[in-house]
């Protein structure tokens, strides 16, 4: 009896634990508000309407799909809704042939929604198939506008036609994680410049609410912000992430593109226009037409359509620091698709008065404005590019224009192509009234290009501890710049000159220049000073200074060819 009394509490306790455990299991199994297991489109539509009526911030209405489902007309998804599709289950677009409508939209066309109106929407799992047929016209799979806290998780979106797989405008808090975007299709039937049109279509478009094709609800100046795209795959597409429109003075903030893979993209993998406080990190970009574009407003780049000014919104140019970073990316481009292709294309500009290229905006949105730029300093300000590995063939790797207060550090850049072709590892080129300014280039390795670095129309530029070798024409070309070169190494016998310069002010410190076929440092109409370092094994002079002199001290000259020990010449 005593033993029974002692055991009874333990038995009761164990029984309570089992009961609780069983309850939790049952509750977990019935967590969905509705399950669509019969493939009925009508049932799915009704479930979405139920979610619209019953879902709240405290109770997200969960719809579970367990069997393939055909979508017969455009579908609206509303706040506080979660759609979960089982693995390998297909959601198949089956709209009437020739219907170019969006398959899934957040909200209702013609609504007055504005700001970040719709909220708490999750799409998870499954294969969302565009099911392109011969008579179909272009469509988007998902369109998200005026929303917040929207998630796309663990799913595949495939077979889109001449549209975007996800198009988002005016979204605060968009998460796209572990999503496979693949197989964009285009018939090229109705377009004069077929390839250019194809390349307009980003799989994930982060757009502005300017046209009826992008806006559900009001046309307003609310921008995308707090967007995360992580661990996604982009395969066989026109473009990866980005947009081909921008509104001057409208900035996207806290945009994070991390750990994604891009393969076989015809145009660029990532296009960032007017971004602030953003990160593009640890992505793999393989066999794409271009790599990463980071620009303020529209550059002169193939495939972009326009930057617009909207008078109604009274926006201003924000010239404060971008505070953005591009780092840890692997970019390999062997088949550039145009003369403008770059692994990294960084572009800003400075506008002294409003630039109007085309008056008027689309009449449907009842906004006044023009295609062009606001007056102001649009140069990229405070961008860090670091620890990227770049390999290219028959193209310039990195292009800088209109950059200030920025850093380019610890990047590896390699060329695999015909060195006689006029391609550069790093081009820092601008125009006299839009100078690159206060830029540090440090700790980089650049090899096998026709010319390693080109720098023009720039001031307060510092090259530090950077190695450039095996260039064909020259390691560094300078024109119209104020530049300091410290602790760099310029080597290998193929190059004509170590440094070639024109109309510049040069400060060269503790830099080694070796094995140039002609001059270690060739300068025309330049001023400056060379201190320390060595200039050795050059075919002609160590320093050849024409029209103006270059002074030097504590430089070790050895084995330079012309006139034996003559290392300095002024013509």
Task: Label every model-predicted segment.
Residues 12, 16-21, 83:
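Hydrophobic core
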């Amino acid at each position: 009896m005593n033993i029974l009394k002692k055991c009874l509490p333990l038995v009761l306790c164990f029984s309570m634990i089992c009961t609780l455990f069983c309850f939790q299991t049952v509750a977990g199994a019935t967590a969905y508000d509705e399950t669509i297991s019969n493939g009925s489109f009508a049932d799915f539509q009704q479930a979405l309407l139920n979610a619209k009526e019953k879902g709240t911030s405290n109770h997200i209405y969960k719809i579970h799909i367990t069997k393939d489902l055909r979508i017969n007309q455009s579908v609206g998804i509303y706040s506080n809704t979660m759609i979960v599709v089982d693995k390998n289950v297909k959601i198949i677009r089956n709209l009437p042939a020739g219907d170019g409508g969006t398959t899934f939209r957040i909200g209702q066309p013609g609504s007055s929604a504005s700001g970040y109106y719709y909220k708490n929407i999750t799409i998870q799992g499954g294969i969302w198939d565009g099911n392109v047929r011969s008579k179909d016209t272009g469509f988007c799979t998902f369109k998200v506008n005026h929303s917040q806290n929207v998630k796309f998780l663990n799913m595949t979106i495939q077979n889109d036609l001449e549209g975007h797989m996800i198009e988002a405008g005016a979204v605060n808090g968009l998460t796209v994680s572990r999503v496979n975007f693949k197989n964009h299709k285009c018939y090229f039937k109705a377009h004069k410049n077929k390839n250019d049109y194809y390349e307009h279509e980003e799989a994930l478009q982060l757009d502005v609410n300017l046209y009826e094709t992008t806006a559900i609800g009001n046309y307003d100046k609310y921008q995308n912000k707090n967007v995360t795209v992580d661990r996604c795959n982009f395969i066989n597409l026109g473009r990866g992430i980005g947009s081909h429109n921008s509104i001057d003075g409208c900035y996207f903030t806290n945009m994070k593109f991390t750990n994604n893979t891009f393969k076989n993209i015809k145009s660029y993998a990532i296009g960032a226009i007017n971004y602030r406080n953003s990160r593009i990190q640890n992505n793999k970009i393989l066999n794409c037409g271009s790599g990463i574009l980071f620009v303020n407003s529209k550059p002169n780049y193939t495939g972009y359509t326009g930057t617009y000014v909207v008078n109604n919104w009274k926006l201003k140019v924000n010239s404060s620091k971008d505070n953005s970073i591009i780092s840890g990316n692997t970019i390999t481009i062997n088949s550039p698709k145009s003369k403008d292709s770059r692994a990294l294309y960084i572009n800003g500009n400075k506008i002294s008065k409003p630039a109007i290229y085309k008056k008027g905006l689309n009449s449907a949105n009842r906004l006044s404005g023009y295609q062009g730029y606001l007056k102001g300093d649009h140069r990229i300000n405070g961008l860090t590019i670091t620890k990227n590995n770049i390999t290219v063939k028959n193209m310039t790797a990195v292009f800088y224009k209109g950059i200030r207060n920025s850093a380019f550090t610890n990047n590896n850049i390699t060329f695999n192509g015909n060195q006689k072709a006029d391609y550069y590892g790093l081009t820092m080129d601008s125009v006299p009234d839009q100078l690159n300014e206060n830029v540090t280039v440090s700790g980089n390795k650049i090899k096998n290009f026709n010319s390693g670095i080109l720098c023009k129309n720039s001031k307060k530029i510092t090259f530090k501890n950077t190695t450039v070798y095996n260039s064909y024409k020259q390691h560094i070309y300078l024109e119209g710049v104020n530049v300091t070169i410290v602790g760099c190494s310029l080597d290998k016998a193929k190059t004509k000159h170590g440094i070639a310069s024109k109309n510049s002010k040069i400060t060269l410190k503790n830099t080694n220049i070796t094995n140039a076929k002609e001059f270690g440092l060739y300068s025309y109409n330049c001023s400056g000073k060379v201190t320390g370092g060595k200039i050795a094994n050059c075919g002609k002079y160590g320093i050849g200074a024409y029209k103006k002199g270059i002074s030097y001290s504590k430089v070790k000259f050895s084995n330079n060819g012309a006139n034996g020990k003559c290392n300095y010449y002024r013509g």
